[in-house]
Swiss-Prot record:
Protein known as: Protease
Subcellular location: Virion; Host nucleus
Subunit structure comment from the entry: Interacts with protease cofactor pVI-C; this interaction is necessary for protease activation.
Organism name: Human adenovirus E serotype 4 (HAdV-4)
Signal peptide segment: none
Note, other: All late proteins expressed from the major late promoter are produced by alternative splicing and alternative polyadenylation of the same gene giving rise to non-overlapping ORFs. A leader sequence is present in the N-terminus of all these mRNAs and is recognized by the viral shutoff protein to provide expression although conventional translation via ribosome scanning from the cap has been shut off in the host cell.
Regulation: Requires DNA and protease cofactor for maximal activation. Inside nascent virions, becomes partially activated by binding to the viral DNA, allowing it to cleave the cofactor that binds to the protease and fully activates it. Actin, like the viral protease cofactor, seems to act as a cofactor in the cleavage of cytokeratin 18 and of actin itself.
Gene3D superfamilies: Adenoviral Proteinase, Chain A
Annotated site residues (Cleavage) in this chain: 53-54
Family: Belongs to the peptidase C5 family.
Species lineage: Viruses, Varidnaviria, Bamfordvirae, Preplasmiviricota, Tectiliviricetes
Any one GO MF annotation of this record: cysteine-type endopeptidase activity
Length: 201
């Protein structure tokens, strides 16, 4: 997908972060869901078809211990808002994942807006580590770096310093843990500059 962070770049960062054993791959909107109910898994999913070049990156994770599906969306959009903006909804993904479980029931968990991006389409490398961690929102080394803000305040100047600190914290984390990021830091930071984020929205 032609975006600020392409699939190859995302896979390289994810490999550096040690998420490989859990990572199913990068997918477009046709991601089939989590079909192996007994395995911890995560995936990076775009809201558009691969043939379009991509629009917005989301991260999903599956925790079999609690039949819990996690979503990390840097913008914190609701299912209704994602459908309105991108014609993408995750209810179908949940239904497909639930059909693979013994009792056909899953728990759904999301997160406040963090708006941290490594890529024009809203992907944050925090997505990959958040999803790969067995307890994605608890004691996670990247999620604990970030401060969420209410979704309704995403465009408010009041939260801009928080969002900027989130992005800088993520860059520092990736610089410490990803050889790929270190080798391509100047290009990645230019492509994902905070001001560019505002222009793209």
């Amino acid at each position: 997908m032609a975006a600020g962070s392409g699939e190859q770049e995302l896979r390289a960062i994810i490999r550096d972060l040690g998420c490989g054993p859990y990572f199913l791959g990068t997918f477009d909107k046709r991601f089939p869901g989590f079909m192996a109910p007994h395995k911890v898994a995560c995936a990076i999913v775009n809201t558009a078809g691969r043939e379009t070049g991509g629009e917005h990156w989301l991260a999903f994770a599956w925790n079999p211990r609690s039949n819990t599906c996690y979503l990390f969306d840097p913008f914190g959009f609701s299912d209704q808002r994602l459908k309105q903006i991108y014609q993408f909804e995750y209810e179908g993904l949940l239904r497909r994942s639930a059909l693979a479980t013994k009792d056909r029931c899953v728990t759904w968990k999301s997160h406040q807006t963090c708006r941290v991006r490594v890529g024009r389409c809203g992907f944050s490398a925090a997505c990959s580590t958040a999803c790969a961690w067995p307890t994605p929102m608890d004691k996670n080394p990247t999620m604990n770096l970030l401060t969420g803000v209410p979704n309704g305040m995403l465009q408010s100047p009041q939260v801009e310093p928080t969002l900027r600190r989130n992005q800088e914290a993520l860059y520092r984390f990736l610089n410490s843990h990803s050889a790929y990021f270190r080798s391509h830091r100047a290009r990645i930071e230019k492509a994902t500059a905070f001001d560019r984020m505002n222009q793209d929205m």
